[in-house]
Amino acid sequence: MAHKKAGGSSRNGRDSAGQRRGVKRYGGEFVRAGNILVRQLGTKFHPGKNVGLGRDYTLFAMIDGIVAFEYKDKTRQQISVYPIPAQE
């Protein structure tokens, strides 16, 4: 009688999809109003000039302009969007 004992079942073998967090637009890039700049957990980056903060701490541009990463103080980093001066 060629029998084989039942093997145990593995308790591994699962993986969740990533949440696509991180910086979406970098310093010096041109953005349009409403563009998402950063997706984050908590305020790793704080909103600066012309940048809004969403319910889930997403930072987004409130005007068309150029992105700038700055330091509020020694530890806190902020992101601002500055308008492009009008060309004559």
Curated annotation (Swiss-Prot):
InterPro entries with a match to the protein in the record: Ribosomal_bL27
This protein's record includes keyword Ribosomal protein: yes
Entries under Gene3D superfamilies matching the protein: 2.40.50.100
Keywords: Ribonucleoprotein, Ribosomal protein
Keyword Ribonucleoprotein: yes
Region described as Disordered: spans on this chain: 1-24
Disulfide bonds listed in the record: none
Annotated GO CC locations: cytosolic large ribosomal subunit
MF term (GO), any: structural constituent of ribosome
Name of the protein in its database record: Large ribosomal subunit protein bL27
Gene field: rpmA
